[in-house]
């Protein structure tokens, strides 16, 4: 498995990303189905760990999992005007079934606000039925024109939460709770990816939403990636689907609803935040295999002694570490080292006859490729040493990504400075422009306002585009 399979980031960043997806065995383009991918075992194992950590957080905030139909009557999509306009180009329709034309076409789920809204209108009658807090894990389809594995595909996998509340304040509280306690917490603690928490502009918000909040991350090419969104839908979908309830005063009111989701594009964020020119780098908490052991021997006698030591060593790891012993005799140790490095396994343990005699092992850490990350350590206390090292690596990856983002983020005061800064990263600027101004900037620079950060400086400055005074800052960047 030669190193040349990975294009260097400095040569072609896009090809580097595609090479890692392929060589780390994460996914394969499904060329027989336009815009779709096959998520392979290693990629799906990462997604399963993400699901588990997210699901725990979602349930801890009082939500239950449900499952709604994949097919949605087209008339449902047409009920909410902004929603229709936002999703019309991406919708895939089913018009025939059982050899006949359907009386009404179905839309393959692009998102589920409409069909869930229909059922909520049946289930909610009284204020006693609120809040209704549901989440579903599902696949969705959006007919994307330009696709890239994990980052943008026609079919992808996600969770989508949908809740209904008695008041706007409760819906807003829910929207922000998900943003902070579920999404930002997960992405920073599990993925080791620092995020900016913010509000979307009117131009960038979810179609049909009252307000959209997001978390934005910086990739190694300086571009932004939207890692999660949480929407306060106001009463727009409640009015479209007649989601009403009788309040404590026996008055009929429309419910206030929210929706929020993250998807398999987080795997793309993971790749582009931490990986290097040697291959995939995974934060230990999301590594399907945290430790790989490569036994080294030349004959049956050596094999017996080495494997006895390996079995004794790994017995203490069960239930504490996710590990694999790579004792395949059909591949050389060098091949195995390269393979597991490509796949991003955080820690590699090498053990041969000399190590058995000395009661030591060679330990290589993935976040420090080459000699810098390799050391010889005693077998005694190895379990605790590895656990401490994994925790150190998790923190180190986050701090490294945070330092990178800070180094690539700059305050700009003029439009020329903005255009220069977005070539290398995030531009932070005061903003008092209109949606039309936003569109012009995007047309001229291909950059968008990623968010209005929730943390504001509390000072006044002049808008980078209009020159008007404002106390609001925004983040401009090119994005995936």
UniProtKB/Swiss-Prot annotation:
Q: Which UniProt keywords apply?
A: Aminoacyl-tRNA synthetase, ATP-binding, Cytoplasm, Ligase, Nucleotide-binding, Protein biosynthesis
Under the heading Gene3D superfamilies, the entry gives: Anticodon-binding domain, Bira Bifunctional Protein, Domain 2, C-terminal domain of ProRS
Entry coiled-coil feature ranges: none
Q: Which GO terms describe its biological process?
A: prolyl-tRNA aminoacylation
The protein's annotated catalytic reaction(s) are: tRNA(Pro) + L-proline + ATP = L-prolyl-tRNA(Pro) + AMP + diphosphate
> Is Cytoplasm given among the entry's keywords?
yes
Write one Gene Ontology MF term.
Answer: ATP binding
Which GO cellular component does the record give, naming just one?
A: aminoacyl-tRNA synthetase multienzyme complex
Q: What is its EC number?
A: 6.1.1.15
UniProt cross-references to InterPro entries, sorted A to Z: aa-tRNA-synt_IIb, aa-tRNA-synth_II, aa-tRNA-synth_II/BPL/LPL, Anticodon-bd, Anticodon-bd_dom_sf, Pro-tRNA-ligase_IIa, Pro-tRNA-ligase_IIa_arc-type, Pro-tRNA_ligase_II_C
Class of enzymatic activity (EC top level):
ligase
**SUBUNIT field:** Homodimer.
Summarize the protein's role.
Answer: Catalyzes the attachment of proline to tRNA(Pro) in a two-step reaction: proline is first activated by ATP to form Pro-AMP and then transferred to the acceptor end of tRNA(Pro).
What's this protein's family per the entry?
Answer: Belongs to the class-II aminoacyl-tRNA synthetase family. ProS type 3 subfamily.
Its domain comment says: Consists of three domains: the N-terminal catalytic domain, the anticodon-binding domain and the C-terminal extension.
Provide the protein name. Proline--tRNA ligase
């Amino acid at each position: 498995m030669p190193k040349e399979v990975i294009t260097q980031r400095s040569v072609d960043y896009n090809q580097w990303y595609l090479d890692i997806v392929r060589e780390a065995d994460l996914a394969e383009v499904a060329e027989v189905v336009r815009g779709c991918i096959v998520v392979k075992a290693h990629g799906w194992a990462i997604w399963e760990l993400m699901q588990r950590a997210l699901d725990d957080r979602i349930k801890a905030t009082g939500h239950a999992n449900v499952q709604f139909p994949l097919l949605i009557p087209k008339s449902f999509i047409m009920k909410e005007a902004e929603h229709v306009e936002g999703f019309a180009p991406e919708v895939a329709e089913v018009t025939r079934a059982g050899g006949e034309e359907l009386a009404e076409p179905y839309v393959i789920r692009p998102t589920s606000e409409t069909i869930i809204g229909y059922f909520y209108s049946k289930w909610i009658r009284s204020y006693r039925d609120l809040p209704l807090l549901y989440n579903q894990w599902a696949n969705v389809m959006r007919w994307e024109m330009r696709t890239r594995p994990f980052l943008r595909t026609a079919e992808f996998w996600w969770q989508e939460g949908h809740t209904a509340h008695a008041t706007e304040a409760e819906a807003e509280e829910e929207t922000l709770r998900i943003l902070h306690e579920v999404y930002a917490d997960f992405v920073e603690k599990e993925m080791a990816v620092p995020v900016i928490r913010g509000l979307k502009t009117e131009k960038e918000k979810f179609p049909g939403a009252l307000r959209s909040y997001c978390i934005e991350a910086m990739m190694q090419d300086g571009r932004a990636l939207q890692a999660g969104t949480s929407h306060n839908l106001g009463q727009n979908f409640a009015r479209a689907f007649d989601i009403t309830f009788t309040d404590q005063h026996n008055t009929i009111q429309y419910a206030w609803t929210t929706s929020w989701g993250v998807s398999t594009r987080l795997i793309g964020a993971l790749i582009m935040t931490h990986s290097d020119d040697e291959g995939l780098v995974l934060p230990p908490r999301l590594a399907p295999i945290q430790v790989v052991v490569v036994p080294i021997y030349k004959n049956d006698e050596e094999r017996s002694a080495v494997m006895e030591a390996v079995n004794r060593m790994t017995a203490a790891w069960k239930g504490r570490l996710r590990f694999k012993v790579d004792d395949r005799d059909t591949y050389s140790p060098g091949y195995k080292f390269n393979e597991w490095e490509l796949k991003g396994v955080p820690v590699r343990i090498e053990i041969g006859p000399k190590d058995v005699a000395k009661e030591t092992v060679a330990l290589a850490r993935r976040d420090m490729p080459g000699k810098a990350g390799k050391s010889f350590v005693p077998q005694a206390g190895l379990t605790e040493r590895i656990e401490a090292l994994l925790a150190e690596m998790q923190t180190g990856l986050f701090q490294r990504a945070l330092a990178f983002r800070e180094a690539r983020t700059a305050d700009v005061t003029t439009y020329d400075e903005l255009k220069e800064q977005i070539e290398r990263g995030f531009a932070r600027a005061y903003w008092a422009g209109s949606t039309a101004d936003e569109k012009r900037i995007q047309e001229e620079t291909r950059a968008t306002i990623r968010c209005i950060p929730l943390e504001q400086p509390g000072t006044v400055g002049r808008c980078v585009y209009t020159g008007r005074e404002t106390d609001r800052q925004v983040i401009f960047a090119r994005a995936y």
